[in-house]
């Protein structure tokens, strides 16, 4: 038998024969000096790391893109912050609004300002004043300075006085070109004679008393003399407002219509600023609305800031409607009686109604005017009601010779009565026309509003101009003429009045866009 050593040699030889290129060395193989060195094998590189490197590169690219987007966002925020800090409003062009009389308009970017905080400081000196300081974060005015202003400016005042800090022109953020009251407080300056302006940003407002409007009501808490303003709204209307207005904003806009005529709203705003030269709504009345909302609904300063924006928006809407020749009337007021009107239409440019002692006394009734018809067999009467609609009434008078008189009277109920007066001064016939809407409001181009029976419109035709000769007038032949009523005591005085007014019976007005304007 073969020994163990011999068997190992045989196995080694057999393995070398099987793999001549890669000889396998067994563990028990002993290398001697005579043996040849083993062949070195070539090392193969493994490329399995390529997908991992590509994934890392893609992630790095994604991070870089996000960093670039973050940098762009930071730059945008820096630009906006600089824009707000430096108050640099970049104007933008907006397309023309349909029906706009001025064509394309220009506006500014809306910038919301910080809502000012209201601090009420009571002053127990003899003037019993209130210091209502509107603190702006950009202002460093101290409360003591405002109290000193009161002490130096209004010594010995009997009524309460409000001192208001008004944001200056540079502090206002204009919402658009029509209003400059985006950031200003509503009670910024006073339109009453008892108010005084101190500096550019402080105005004194003297609170009124019950004697100013004995038939009116209080805005605000009537038991708190520091948070109430007397207004001309009668108690029944105030009850109606309190019942129907469920939100603070609706009540504010409703009170605005009761306290300010739409004509006043169209030419005014809260700040009295803007490129259109608008006037300022009476700050005392606006302060009364503010007190009323705080008392009824417990609103906050933030709510009042939003309501002020709605008031300014309502004024801008009235201004646009006026520019387009549209009606400015309040539809809910169309059935109100003259006594329930809180404003005086005969004085539309006043922010608030005058006290009861200054109201004009009603003219005696009836009022009459003798008007000479020129071959007219039909009289057309135009009236504009409080809803702004032109109401037309027709009167047919048969066989009225040229040169004879027609007497127009108005009774205490507002009804018009047309009388045909013969040459002997006797009333031949009478026709009664119910008053279409009372009071009738006639608007002139100057902005003056005439109320009730102060002005009526009758229609006739000049035979030479219309080409008619005693035949019934056609609608196109009627020329609208306006004649002011004059009180007469008898028919003789009426005839003299007609002779005096005869040269003035020329067409002076025209009907345009549903409103009557003086040429």
Curated annotation (Swiss-Prot):
Post-translational modification note: MAPK1/MAPK3-mediated phosphorylation at Thr-337 and Thr-352 results in export to the cytoplasm.
Modified residues (Phosphothreonine): 337, 352
Record field: compositional bias (Low complexity): 180-189
Modified residues (Phosphoserine): 19, 90, 100
Biased composition range(s): Basic and acidic residues: 168-177
Matching Gene3D superfamilies: BEN domain
Residues covered by region (Disordered): 168-196, 327-364
Record's compositionally biased regions (Pro residues): 351-364
Cross-link Glycyl lysine isopeptide (Lys-Gly) (interchain with G-Cter in SUMO2) mapped to chain: 133
BEN domain segment(s): 226-322
Keywords: Acetylation, Cell cycle, Chromatin regulator, Coiled coil, Cytoplasm, Developmental protein, DNA-binding, Isopeptide bond, Nucleus, Phosphoprotein, Repressor, RNA-binding, Transcription, Transcription regulation, Tumor suppressor, Ubl conjugation
InterPro entries recorded: BANP (IPR042343), BEN_domain (IPR018379)
GO MF terms held by the record: DNA binding; identical protein binding
Protein purpose: Controls V(D)J recombination during T-cell development by repressing T-cell receptor (TCR) beta enhancer function. Binds to scaffold/matrix attachment region beta (S/MARbeta), an ATC-rich DNA sequence located upstream of the TCR beta enhancer. Represses cyclin D1 transcription by recruiting HDAC1 to its promoter, thereby diminishing H3K9ac, H3S10ph and H4K8ac levels. Promotes TP53 activation, which causes cell cycle arrest. Plays a role in the regulation of alternative splicing.
Protein name, per record: Protein BANP
Protein source organism: Homo sapiens
Organism phylogeny: Eukaryota, Metazoa, Chordata, Craniata, Vertebrata
